[in-house]
């Protein structure tokens, strides 16, 4: 008799994805972040659902409904802070996951990589709309500034912005539709993640060497299930330390002031995980140019498979490319820091240099390094 997990139509899918899946024997902890992203998504959907039960998406009551959740709802404060800081953990895992893909050449799986880019854009859109919902000062002005960027589109820009706003400024209609989108998008993300996994399992996982591991596979369970559980416990530990000891560490104090269209905060800035893109946007003096650079800062990931010049897939045995990769990481950290600083010297110049370096590294220096390494190895 065949085991039920191998014959049952539903259990068979779970079995082939998480139990009997043949996995490379040498994948490191950098491969843990896919499962951690799944855990983050489930946690965000669950906490978000409970928050939505008490939240009201009306400009007059949104701010006080969030205060009500924290003060009067049973364990509302922990649900709210798990959701807010869970988003930060989500992005930490996302950026590490993308970085892992860059370092080890996982972008060679084109379908998986491209759906990953779509997922990244969708998660960023969801997080942006979620930040608007508490209707604090930074929520309101962040929404105003970012949506206003669309007005840089020639001819249709202004009409497009007013269409998104549902009026002539960010108001009740905007908040209402942002809440609706913020509620539905995580389910779309879950569906896309399923497709992401589907395409990954067509090819099987990459591994640190970048060489085919077909001759040396081990079952996913128990080896990688136990490894993923350890990763999950560490993620939950860090999240709980953040939530229980300094829940507002990554937030903006301005968001504890109710939204006021008549009073602009001195420094409008998004959440920390968007600061690198915000710094790139601000470093270009032209509005349309800035918007294009902002979009390209993420969309550039789609061109990476085309820019791969090395005859080796992974960077594991490519020291020049490794140096450039870690320079890119340092550059992104610099951009993140600059994004949170006021627009004044020397920050303007640092931001411009870091932005140029970001695009130069990906478009020019890394492909050139691949060619040089091929010559060094006489390939």
Curated annotation (Swiss-Prot):
Q: Name one GO biological process term.
A: mitochondrial electron transport, ubiquinol to cytochrome c
Name the source's superkingdom: Eukaryota
Q: For this UniProt entry, what is the primary localization, expressed as one broad class?
A: mitochondrion
How the cofactor is bound: the record states: Binds 2 heme b groups non-covalently.
Quote the cellular component terms of the Gene Ontology held in the record: mitochondrial inner membrane; respiratory chain complex III
**What membrane topology does the annotation report for this chain?**
Multi-pass membrane protein
Q: Where in the cell is it found?
A: Mitochondrion inner membrane
Sample GO molecular function, one term: metal ion binding
Residue positions annotated to bind a ubiquinone are 201
Q: Which Pfam families match?
A: Cytochrom_B_C, Cytochrome_B
Keywords of this entry: Electron transport, Heme, Iron, Membrane, Metal-binding, Mitochondrion, Mitochondrion inner membrane, Respiratory chain, Transmembrane, Transmembrane helix, Transport, Ubiquinone
Q: Which residues form each disulfide bond in the chain?
A: none
The record describes its quaternary structure and partners as:
The cytochrome bc1 complex contains 11 subunits: 3 respiratory subunits (MT-CYB, CYC1 and UQCRFS1), 2 core proteins (UQCRC1 and UQCRC2) and 6 low-molecular weight proteins (UQCRH/QCR6, UQCRB/QCR7, UQCRQ/QCR8, UQCR10/QCR9, UQCR11/QCR10 and a cleavage product of UQCRFS1). This cytochrome bc1 complex then forms a dimer.
As for family, the record states: Belongs to the cytochrome b family.
Q: What does this protein do?
A: Component of the ubiquinol-cytochrome c reductase complex (complex III or cytochrome b-c1 complex) that is part of the mitochondrial respiratory chain. The b-c1 complex mediates electron transfer from ubiquinol to cytochrome c. Contributes to the generation of a proton gradient across the mitochondrial membrane that is then used for ATP synthesis.
Q: State the remark under miscellaneous.
A: Heme 1 (or BL or b562) is low-potential and absorbs at about 562 nm, and heme 2 (or BH or b566) is high-potential and absorbs at about 566 nm.
Q: What is this protein called?
A: Cytochrome b
State the species of origin.
Answer: Lama vicugna (Vicugna)
């Amino acid at each position: 008799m065949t085991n039920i997990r191998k014959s049952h139509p539903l259990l068979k899918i779970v079995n082939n994805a998480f139990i009997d899946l043949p996995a490379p024997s040498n994948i490191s902890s950098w491969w843990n972040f896919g499962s951690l992203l799944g855990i983050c998504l489930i946690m965000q959907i669950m906490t978000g659902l409970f928050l939505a039960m008490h939240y009201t998406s009306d400009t007059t009551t949104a701010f006080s409904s969030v205060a009500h959740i924290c003060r009067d709802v049973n364990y509302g404060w922990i649900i709210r802070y798990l959701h807010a800081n869970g988003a930060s953990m989500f992005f930490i895992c996302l950026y590490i996951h993308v970085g892992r893909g860059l370092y080890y050449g996982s972008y060679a799986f084109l379908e998986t990589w491209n759906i990953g880019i779509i997922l990244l854009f969708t998660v960023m859109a969801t997080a942006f709309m979620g930040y608007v919902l508490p209707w604090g000062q930074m929520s309101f002005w962040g929404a105003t500034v970012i949506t206003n960027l669309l007005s840089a589109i020639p001819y249709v820009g202004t009409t497009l912005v007013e269409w998104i706003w549902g009026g002539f400024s960010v108001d009740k209609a905007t908040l209402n539709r942002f809440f609706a989108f913020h509620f539905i998008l995580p389910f779309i993300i879950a569906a896309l993640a399923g497709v992401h996994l589907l395409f990954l399992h067509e090819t099987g996982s990459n591994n640190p060497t970048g060489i085919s591991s077909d001759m040396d596979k081990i079952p996913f369970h128990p080896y990688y299930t136990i490894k993923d559980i350890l990763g999950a416990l560490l993620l939950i530990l860090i999240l709980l330390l953040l939530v229980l000891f300094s829940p507002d560490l990554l937030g903006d104090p301005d968001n504890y002031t109710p939204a006021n269209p008549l009073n602009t905060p001195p420094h409008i800035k998004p959440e920390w995980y968007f600061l690198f893109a915000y710094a790139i946007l601000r470093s270009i003096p032209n509005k349309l140019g800035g918007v294009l650079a902002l979009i390209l800062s993420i969309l550039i990931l789609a061109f990476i498979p085309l820019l791969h010049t090395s005859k080796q897939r992974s960077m594991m045995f490519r020291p020049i490319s490794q140096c450039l990769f870690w320079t890119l990481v340092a550059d992104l950290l610099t951009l993140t820091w600059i994004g949170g600083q006021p627009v004044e010297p020397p920050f303007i110049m640092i931001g411009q240099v870091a932005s140029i370096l970001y695009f130069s590294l990906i478009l020019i220096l890394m492909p050139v390094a691949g060619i040089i390494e091929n010559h060094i190895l006489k390939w």
